[in-house]
Amino acid sequence: NLSSPPRVKQVTTNEEAFEELALKRYDLIITMPGVDCSETFTQAKAMKRLYPYIPIVVLTPFSHEVSRRIAKEDLSGVDYVFSWLGNVDLLVAIIKLIEDKMNAEVDITSVGVQLILLVEDSIRFYSSILPNLYNFVLKQSQIFSTEALNDHERMLRMRGRPKVMLARTYEEAMQIYEKYSGNML
């Protein structure tokens, strides 16, 4: 469901990551914590200071221990934390969620695209529900796009699919709702 598959560059050390970021333009950083969760979040903050325009996602294995450690971390350097539950559709959902967040302002206020707001604070739950939600929305959009008369109209209908936004707190949900209340599904 991506117009073109993403290119992925894997690095094994923080030094390699910073070297790559200095050499090439990247649209997304996905980092996976090792044994020391704190180092991951410290490095994410350092990356965010240097590259504030690049979304940073932490992808963790699911365990109660990891969840407890994340609850104590400063998450200011990351845009999202997701729990890897073995569903590869999560990667597409992460990309789509970030695209939707970046495009929401123009697509919703100028074009009139609808918005689905998911309000959830459980990393494990939103990591499992978002791939299902996006699969449903994208399938419905594909069905709708088959009614188009030509390729251009088909692409416009696919791009006009409802946007999905994730709020992890009540305050965040209210802020999004107040901004886009006229376009909520």
Walk through the language-model features, giving the residues of each.
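Two-component/phosphorelay signaling modules centered on CheY-like receiver
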Residues: N1-K9, R124-M165
